[in-house]
Regions:
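Short Lys/Arg-enriched helix C-cap and helix-to-coil transition segments
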Residues: 33-41
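Intrinsic disorder/low-complexity detector
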Residues: 7-9, 35, 49
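Polyanion-binding surface elements
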Residues: 1-24, 54-55
Length: 56
């Protein structure tokens, strides 16, 4: 089964970047779209793949 949502740590591992980089991007309104669910940040796979298509 494929993951449909990634948390910050999972996405940082996928992209080989620091979780702190994702935090900074959110603060700067950069990076992929994200959702806050119950106080947690999650990234939808569709948004991740769209960001990858536009920036890779």
């Amino acid at each position: 089964m494929e993951l449909r949502h990634f948390n910050q740590v999972q996405l940082s591992r996928r992209w080989c970047i620091s979780p702190r980089t994702l935090e900074r991007w959110r603060w700067l309104r950069q990076g992929p779209n994200y959702l806050k669910v119950g106080g947690r940040v999650v990234y939808r796979l569709d948004d991740i793949e769209e960001y990858e298509r536009r920036h890779v």
